[in-house]
């Protein structure tokens, strides 16, 4: 789902803050010993325990059945490029997307797996491409059927509007499955005049599939470590992925900064930092050599989570990648520079 500028780069940067598992190595280990523990009363209060070492939190997702959460997600991306393709002038592209959607807790299994009924109510997109001597701007609103609404680029957005589908999420915040998209696909096929054969339909479903929708929604769901975490303690995780064609190791550091109890509700705040290590800075294929000559990357984020309600209430992340690449072939070479920044802002509206 959801086309982005510099897709390969953006995938890495967005997912960096959302793929949080419990297998990361912690800088401060959480003691699971329950001796001398004191628990508060209230819904999900057993997730917060005080002992002789401090306040310890089990980071679990425990909403109540039939609860409904309404969210706004804003994703802003700015890409700046200087290359021979842009006439060695700076080309600036921006994409500003707002998603409005709801999640209803449809079922909670015996193992704690939560099934949400999800529905997108509105999506609007502002895209701009500008250089020193020209600028092009386009605005899409899923609720306004204008000339932009009918463009092929937006079929995927139109097709999912107001259609219910389902997401299964583990107690640790990882989306394990997206299903129930049959009506969405039916809308897509109809918008193309039902002219597609079986192979073309499968190709379209693959390009706008469960994985793409899951990647968007996972940005909201915060993934937690398996072990309990003390206030002011940290944990880390690293995993390998790619930026463009270059293999990298993303190193994620998290810190439980705050725990509050107010009006019989527990809320926590987590701070996050991202560092990127390029494992290989030169790649050769049959036609060309790609070499990173300069790279600066990183990111930060904060997450506010309501333990009592079992939901993210706010999340802000920002990432930056600044990279210079030398392309060589047949004794000739050119240089390109690209800077991509992303800002993600998620708010619980209700």
Can you say where each PLM-predicted feature lies in the sequence?
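Signature of exported/secreted
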Residues: 25-350
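C-terminal motif of bacterial Sec signal peptides marking the signal peptidase cleavage site
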Residues: 19-22
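Bacterial N-terminal signal peptides that target proteins for export
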Residues: 1-10
């Amino acid at each position: 789902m959801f086309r982005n500028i510099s897709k390969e780069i953006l995938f890495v940067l967005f997912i960096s803050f959302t793929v949080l598992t419990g297998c990361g190595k912690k800088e401060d280990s959480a003691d699971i010993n329950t001796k001398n523990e004191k628990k508060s009363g209230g819904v999900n209060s057993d997730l917060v325990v005080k002992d002789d070492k401090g306040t310890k939190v089990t980071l679990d997702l425990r909403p109540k059945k039939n609860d409904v959460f309404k969210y706004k997600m804003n994703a802003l991306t700015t890409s700046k490029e200087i290359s021979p393709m842009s006439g060695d002038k700076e080309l600036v592209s921006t994409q500003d997307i707002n998603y409005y959607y709801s999640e209803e807790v449809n079922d909670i299994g015996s193992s704690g797996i939560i099934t949400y009924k999800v529905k997108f109510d509105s999506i609007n997109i502002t895209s701009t491409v500008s250089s020193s001597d020209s600028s092009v701007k386009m605005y899409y609103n899923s609720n306004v059927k204008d000339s932009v609404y009918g463009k092929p680029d937006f079929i995927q957005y139109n097709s999912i509007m107001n259609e219910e589908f389902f997401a299964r999420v583990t107690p640790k915040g990882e989306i394990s499955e997206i299903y129930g998209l049959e009506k969405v696909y039916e809308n897509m096929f109809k918008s193309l005049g039902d002219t597609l054969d079986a192979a073309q339909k499968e190709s379209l479903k693959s390009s706008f599939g469960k994985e793409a929708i899951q990647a968007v929604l996972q940005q909201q769901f915060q993934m937690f470590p398996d072990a309990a975490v003390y206030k002011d303690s940290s944990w880390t995780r690293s995993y390998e992925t790619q930026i463009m064609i270059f293999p990298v190791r993303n190193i994620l550091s998290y810190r439980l900064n705050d725990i509050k109890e107010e009006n019989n509700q527990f809320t926590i705040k987590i701070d996050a930092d991202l560092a990127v290590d390029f494992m290989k800075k030169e790649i050769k294929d049959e036609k060309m050599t790609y070499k990173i000559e300069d790279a600066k990357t990183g990111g930060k984020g904060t997450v506010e989570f309501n333990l009592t309600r079992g939901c993210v209430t706010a999340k802000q992340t920002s990432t930056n990648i600044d990279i210079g690449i030398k392309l060589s072939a047949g004794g000739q070479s050119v240089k390109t520079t690209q800077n991509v920044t992303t800002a993600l802002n998620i708010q619980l509206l209700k």
